């Protein structure tokens, strides 16, 4: 652990993340072959003939793979690098586009052989996966998904209108998701679920119910992302909303130095889904989770609240009073505890709130005794005149964790 500039203890990602990526790079460099795919040829055929450590270069063009009824591309070979050779400045003609065909559900799925997306346990683990330069379009489930992968890199891809999740690292470890664009999902543009030691850097995420979502994960850093025009910009959600099993430790989600703005999209999620219950206008929504950091972000123009820290049962009962902690017990502690909210720059938030929501820069709501709300620290957010509403007895934002 280390201390932040404010003295708050902050756990850092394990150094094995960087070491793992270095080992991955060295492994792929030794005795590796290069495969090239041109328009009219099959990317999947090259994947199927590749050996661990090989690199596949794909020329610009539009590709529809017909060999797999479930996935556009299925990767189960260790340390494979799949690279789209984008020609900048040529628009659609310069992209490597992967389009949905037939009954395919997910665009790119990387996981060990025999371990499908319906499984929560796999006897094996895929070692190393790298994808760059793909535009994945119009799949009914996910754009690019990893599952049971150790050491993965998802870099400079575009996920367009993949209807559940755009980029979806699940049950995976030691990963980098960097400089991607993801939009048009009906769930989440980028969802880190059940994963550990993941860096999310420099992505643009927009046009979805949630821009960046983190659930049941451990050690996630999100920095220098541009998150805008979603229903909720950043969603840090309780295990009840996860759809994946809980990890032994689910802490240290660090949301720092991002631009989070204008997240006021009318919610496009299908009725009955968890996402359909999200109200528009929230920059960061921390919902019944603990031991996380939201700091040094520029948060502006979110109609309901710039940052909301809310207990799980409080949030669910706002929409349905019968869904309180007594009648609808949560899977885990519903409190938001031990969170650090510091040095965020807040402007023009809460100016056009959803009916029933008090429009403010910072909203803090928890309902004792089920939601104790201990150890939280709101410190040095600016300007000093930012607006807030707090359920604390003294009406102030909590500082007992500072």
Where are these regions (language model features)?
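Right-handed parallel beta-helix
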Residues: 59-60, 79-86, 124-138, 150-164, ...
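Acidic Gly/Asp/Thr-rich repetitive segments characteristic of extracellular carbohydrate-active
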Residues: 33-59, 64
